[in-house]
């Protein structure tokens, strides 16, 4: 059984690849068109774009942190027509050593994802974060974005 056979593993694999900065692994979990909703965290609008655009957006931010770690709870799945709706708790930790205002930023909430079968494999076609709360230095994303452009951290080895 591959990660694309097990819907819950697709979401877990995505988050592991994000934390490792393994961009081919991230892209492999996504549909060609993806809707992302981080409005409860960052404001703005729901984004609809390509999987490649989403990877590029994450590449412009996440390598600026010294480390990220996304921890999820059990993943619940519910059929919705030909798709599956997944939900899980998430605690996302972000670290940037020596940052003014504190080196940790935590985002805690619930991920909701829609998985669509594409050529027999499950892919994420929608991803939304439903916020519970944040803690720590909420200015870290801005600092990490600047650092990602100038001195990004190196990827970690891919996790199976």
Name every feature range the model reports, one short phrase each.
Residues 4-5, 56, 94:
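Generic signal for short, ordered secondary-structure residues
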Residues 22-25, 37, 129, 137:
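Poly-acidic low-complexity segments
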Residues 3, 7, 19, 47, ...:
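Aromatic-acidic/polar surface patches that form glycan- and anion
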Residues 25-91:
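A solvent-exposed, acidic/Ser-Thr-rich amphipathic alpha-helical stretch
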Residues 63-160:
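A beta-strand edge to alpha-helix "cap/lid" segment located at domain peripheries
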Residues 1-32:
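Short, low-complexity N-terminal intrinsically disordered segments enriched in polar/charged residues
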């Amino acid at each position: 059984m591959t990660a694309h056979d097990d819907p819950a593993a697709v979401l877990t694999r995505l988050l592991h690849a994000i934390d490792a900065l393994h961009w081919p692994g991230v892209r492999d979990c996504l549909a060609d068109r993806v809707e992302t909703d981080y409005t409860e965290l960052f404001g703005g609008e729901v984004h609809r774009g390509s999987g490649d655009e989403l990877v590029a957006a994450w590449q412009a931010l996440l390598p600026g942190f010294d480390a990220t770690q996304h921890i999820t709870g059990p993943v619940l799945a519910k059929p919705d027509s030909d798709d599956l709706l997944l939900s899980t708790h998430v605690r996302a930790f972000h670290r940037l050593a020596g940052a003014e205002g504190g080196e940790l930023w935590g985002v805690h909430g619930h991920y909701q994802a829609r998985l669509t079968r594409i050529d027999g494999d499950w892919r994420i076609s929608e991803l939304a974060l439903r916020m519970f709360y944040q803690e720590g230095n909420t200015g870290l994303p801005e600092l990490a974005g600047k650092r990602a452009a100038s001195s990004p951290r190196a990827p970690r080895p891919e996790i199976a």
